């Protein structure tokens, strides 16, 4: 049976690899045995340096399970508690009632640091965790909701968890995670790595690449205006910046089954859903997305996405099956989900299809003079403000609290966004656009011009 699954996994990924439709490393395992482990494509495109199974990837938000586990281990030692208020560890913290549990569960309601940094940060400086703390302490930003009144994925919360780990342990976040998690699990290649803040030459490093619509080539995100925030946000830890290899992640997966690595009680807490004040449950634990499937049992997983990197670890814990997917070339999200779904079907002996990669998006040549008719202020149906601007014969959309993104023409009135399943279509009046429709993941929302 395992041999048959191995053969199908090989067929799936070699088909994709031969057509240059997958650039990354994948590992599939069952019952503690690795069924398939292979790399395709390049670790460094300009040098044509191939990826290998020991290539080191930025995990992005797949770092969050490690940050959460750091907190869990400190709780097991009695050094901190899940119900500790954040102001116990950060005196003067202005968001009252927020606990460590809220940070772990994404129920704190804290403001998102990325939107503020996009708008206010000096991009010539690399931010570190203390800059996030200073923002929260000094900027008077409103939270989204009172603690545990709602659920919103929060990078801010996981940065604060890293800060709390440092204060509670007396060690740097990187050193604590290394000595408490990486080394005990045998993850000798894994590290917290801020590549631009503290660069090292790592021969087996997998550089991440993003698609440049203008040149129709893949480039480092540092070189592209709308992704170069990877430079000035590079010093932030806790929500990302763990770097690892597939074999180490498999060792981590196996260690999580051992009660001497993390206790049964702690695993029960980590893999339990959030319960909000109104009684609603959310399928997120302590750094893990939770699912229950009639066929596949309990599933705990986490993904990561950062310019140039897409990562996923899926643990089918009732069946001791594991999928680990690390990619360093930007791809359509739905396409990557189709790859993972095919691999999952193989692991469970189900029929599967080899997905077809969508073509890279190409812009249409139009007269950019028409852009002036689209420039203005708009209001989305949910009350969010949006600005359409033009600069150097390029058109941009900026939704309040988000990064300014370039709009690429597919016609004179319809535009697409790079690397997102989002399109914008303007409705023209006599002299200027009256509104636009925002199409995203099968839904649509109108934005009406206000100025």
UniProtKB/Swiss-Prot annotation:
The active site is at 61 (acyl-ester intermediate). GO terms for molecular function: hydrolase activity. The keyword Membrane applies. It is a peripheral membrane protein. The keyword Cell cycle does not apply. InterPro entries: Bact_CellWall_Synth/Modif (IPR050491), Beta-lactam-related (IPR001466), Beta-lactam/transpept-like (IPR012338), Peptidase_S12_Pab87-rel_C (IPR021860). Its main location: membrane. GO terms for biological process: cell wall organization; peptidoglycan biosynthetic process; regulation of cell shape; sporulation resulting in formation of a cellular spore. This is Penicillin-binding protein 4*. It comes from Bacillus subtilis (strain 168). The lineage of its organism: Bacteria, Bacillati, Bacillota, Bacilli, Bacillales.
